[in-house]
């Protein structure tokens, strides 16, 4: 991680941190060094999603937001009954994990519904249902990317696995390392070559986009969980399940499936 070059004010404890590049923390008999990166700028005071006046959703067991959730970061609604964000290092790590999982979930949800929608409108796929598509690798003709044999033609699960590891690993390594020259200071919002449209040029608009990204990402993670459950219970894709529900809501609904579900059948 990039080291801080200015004095920091901790939003978790309200205490001034010493203006040094590294913070030393003693652990047992030894000593570990923890490097913290300063945010480039604080969230805009004019946004309703930041600061003490932001919308709060505290849940049934919290009367007020904890002191370490001050509204500095996007998606902070003041709810942390379990105290998962109390430790600054853990909070920073969890924020990064949430954003990365949100982005993958949004891509995944789009990838689950798009082939089914296209197939329903006449586009030919070998298999449009997301959890069945991978099995086409073992079919006689293999799996054609986007149903086109002139693109990627896959017949080896090991080759697909290797490509996934290499490509995804390269992208994540590129992001975490700060790009080819290590110029990126914030691995969550790297900007630069990762922002060719310049969406982060305006700080006010960028702060709003961070909130929108997390909102949509959280919904996408719940959606993916729902797709997993649907696949196990009904054996159908999300679009087909939606069509069945709209055709007969009284029969095709979550309650009916939950009360009649028998594992293994």
UniProtKB/Swiss-Prot annotation:
One of its GO terms (biological process) is photosynthesis, light harvesting. It is a multi-pass membrane protein. Chlorophyll a 6 binds at residues 245, 254. Chlorophyll b 4 binds at residues 164, 175. Chlorophyll b 3 binds at residues 156, 172. Pfam families: Chloroa_b-bind. Photoregulated by reversible phosphorylation of its threonine residues. Chlorophyll b 1 binds at residue 57. The chain crosses the membrane at residues 151-171, 219-239. Chlorophyll a 3 binds at residues 136, 146, 213. Chlorophyll a 4 binds at residue 216. The LHC complex consists of chlorophyll a-b binding proteins. Belongs to the light-harvesting chlorophyll a/b-binding (LHC) protein family. The light-harvesting complex (LHC) functions as a light receptor, it captures and delivers excitation energy to photosystems with which it is closely associated. This is Chlorophyll a-b binding protein type 1 member F3, chloroplastic. It comes from Polystichum munitum. The lineage of its organism: Eukaryota, Viridiplantae, Streptophyta, Embryophyta, Tracheophyta.
């Amino acid at each position: 991680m990039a080291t801080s070059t200015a004095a920091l004010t901790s939003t978790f404890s309200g205490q001034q941190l010493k203006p040094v590049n590294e913070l030393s923390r003693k652990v047992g008999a030894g000593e570990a060094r923890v490097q913290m990166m300063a945010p480039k700028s604080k969230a805009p005071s004019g946004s309703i999603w930041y600061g003490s006046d932001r919308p709060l959703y505290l849940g049934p067991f919290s009367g007020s937001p904890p002191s370490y959730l001050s509204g500095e970061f996007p998606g902070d609604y003041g709810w942390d009954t379990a105290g998962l964000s109390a430790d600054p290092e853990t909070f920073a790590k969890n924020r990064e994990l949430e954003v990365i999982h949100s982005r993958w979930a949004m891509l995944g949800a789009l990838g689950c519904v798009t082939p089914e929608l296209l197939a329903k409108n006449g586009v030919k796929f070998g298999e449009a249902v997301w959890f069945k598509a991978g099995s086409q690798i073992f079919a006689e003709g293999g799996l054609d990317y986007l149903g086109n044999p002139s693109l990627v033609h896959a017949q080896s699960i090991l080759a697909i696995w290797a490509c996934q590891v290499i490509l995804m690993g390269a992208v994540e390594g590129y992001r975490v390392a700060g790009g080819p020259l290590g110029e990126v200071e914030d691995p969550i919002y790297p900007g630069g070559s990762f922002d060719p449209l310049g969406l982060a040029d305006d700080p006010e608009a960028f702060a709003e986009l961070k909130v929108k990204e997390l909102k949509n990402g959280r919904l996408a993670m719940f959606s993916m969980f729902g797709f997993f459950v649907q696949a196990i219970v009904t054996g159908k894709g999300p679009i087909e399940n939606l069509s069945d529900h709209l055709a007969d809501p009284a029969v095709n609904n979550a309650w009916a499936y939950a009360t009649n579900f028998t594992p293994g059948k």
